[in-house]
């Protein structure tokens, strides 16, 4: 009685995993355009069958309260499977005690910020990394030096009388801010003697700090994103309204950084490619018209990631199809304890399958995307290859960008037990 699907001439991938998303995130006095309902449809359309979203513990909250808040946003709304990282912003003895149960039963992975209002200082970073080492968890860290960013924002106010020129944005978050924060994180991690994840690496300067630490024997996992591989800071010289669409943090960098990141992927020195999907509409992006520091930072990318890595990575002969599978599926599954249920096509795994047609020609447009965002950062990009069919736990749920079955995603625990 088995249904037979003819996939001759196609590639089969284990369902892709996007281990860096921000759905229904409240930030910059607004909330992301994509809630779990639309954001996970976008993921599914592109071939992603599981996301790991950042639940955030706000000041004064317990870790359980933070997770419950995210369950209210995600449960019953998600079209792909979903797990959570937990961003830690408030640290004390009570939270340290509570962490044990969370690491055992819910999530092995946590987020720390070195900038923003949610940042942790070096002492807190040391304490959290030490506790995670005890419990078997791991931290992914947003690496930018907050002092440099704040000083340059103030400097711009003094020298130019305001912050309206978006072309000044990358100057306020220079490559040195990333490199210094990466270096500092890795020194702290070395003192603790524990691995860490550097998320959304954007610069050659930051990468050099990682290589240096690895040469000294440290284990450092690295994530980058399609935007840092394919776009550059010239986007900030577009007319202001459009330039704000590309305001992300870390910002887009000089083009020369791209080949360093691609080479690192070719050599297997970067472990995962995620999206940092954090979408806002054109209207939401207008919030920074008088002061770009008030523009909500983030861009969409959920649906586009696999196709972009295929087109510019595999078709562009920078990486192989096998490496694409490793960076988009196998490695994130292994890193975040989702393997072998996710990230593999083996007996006993979840039967999350992407049937990839390498010959389908199509063009990326906002008009045809599932995201609630009303623009596509790669608008007009011509692609050869796409997720023709997407199976979630054995059920056909998407075909050629169209969603066939909504809201069938389930919550995936990935604690160490």
Where are the model-predicted features located?
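Divalent metal-coordination and catalytic microenvironments
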Residues: 9, 20, 43, 47, ...
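Gly-rich Lys/Arg/Thr-decorated short loops/hinges at beta-loop-alpha junctions or inter-strand turns
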Residues: 18-21, 48-53, 79, 159-170
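Histidine/acidic residue-rich metal-binding segments in metalloenzymes
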Residues: 94-273
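Histidine-rich, glycine-flanked metal-binding segment
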Residues: 1-14, 414
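C-terminal cap of metal-dependent C-N hydrolases
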Residues: 287-291, 347-413
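Di-metal (Zn2+ and/or Mg2+/Mn2+) metal-binding site signature of metallo-dependent hydrolases
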Residues: 10-37
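His/Asp/Glu-enriched, well-ordered alpha-helical/loop segment
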Residues: 164-193, 245-246, 266-267, 271-273, ...
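Alpha-helical scaffold segments that flank or form the walls of functional sites
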Residues: 29-83, 89-108, 126-134, 176, ...
């Amino acid at each position: 009685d088995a249904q037979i699907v003819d996939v001759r001439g196609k590639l089969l991938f284990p369902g892709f995993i996007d281990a860096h998303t921000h759905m229904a995130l409240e930030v910059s006095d607004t909330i992301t355009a994509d809630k779990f309902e639309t954001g996970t449809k976008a993921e599914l359309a592109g071939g992603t069958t599981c996301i790991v979203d950042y639940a955030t513990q706000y000041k004064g909250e317990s870790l359980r309260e933070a997770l419950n808040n995210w369950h209210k946003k995600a449960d019953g709304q998600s079209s792909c499977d979903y797990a959570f990282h937990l961003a830690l912003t408030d640290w004390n003895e009570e939270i340290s005690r509570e962490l044990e149960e969370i690491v055992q039963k819910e999530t092995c992975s946590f987020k720390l910020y070195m900038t923003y209002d949610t940042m942790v200082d070096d002492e807190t970073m040391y304490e959290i990394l030490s506790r995670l080492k005890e419990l078997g968890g791991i931290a992914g860290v947003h690496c930018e030096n907050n002092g440099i960013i704040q000083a340059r924002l103030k400097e711009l106010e003094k020298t130019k009388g305001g912050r309206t020129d978006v072309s000044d944005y990358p100057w306020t978050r220079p490559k040195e801010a990333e490199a210094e924060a990466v270096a500092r994180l890795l020194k702290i991690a070395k003192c603790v003697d524990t691995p860490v994840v550097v998320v959304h690496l954007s610069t050659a300067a930051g990468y050099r700090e990682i290589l240096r630490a690895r040469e000294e024997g440290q284990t450092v996992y690295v994530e980058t994103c399609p935007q840092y591989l394919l776009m550059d800071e010239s986007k900030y010289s577009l007319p202001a309204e459009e330039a704000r669409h590309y305001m992300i943090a870390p910002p887009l960098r000089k083009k020369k950084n791209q080949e360093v990141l691609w080479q690192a992927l070719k050599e297997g020195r970067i472990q995962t490619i995620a999206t940092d999907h954090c979408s806002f509409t054109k209207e939401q992006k207008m919030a920074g018209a008088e002061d770009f520091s008030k523009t909500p930072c983030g861009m969409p990318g959920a649906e586009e990631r696999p196709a972009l890595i295929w087109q510019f990575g595999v078709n562009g002969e920078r990486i192989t199809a096998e490496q694409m599978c490793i960076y988009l599926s196998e490695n994130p599954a292994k890193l975040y304890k989702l393997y072998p249920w996710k990230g593999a096509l083996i007996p006993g795994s979840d039967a999350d399958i992407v049937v990839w047609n390498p010959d389908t020609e199509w063009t990326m447009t906002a008009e045809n995307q599932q995201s609630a965002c009303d623009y596509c950062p790669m608008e007009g990009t011509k692609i050869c290859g796409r997720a023709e069919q997407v199976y979630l736990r054995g059920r056909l749920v998407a075909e050629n960008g169209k969603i066939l079955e909504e809201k069938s995603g389930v919550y995936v625990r990935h604690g160490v037990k």
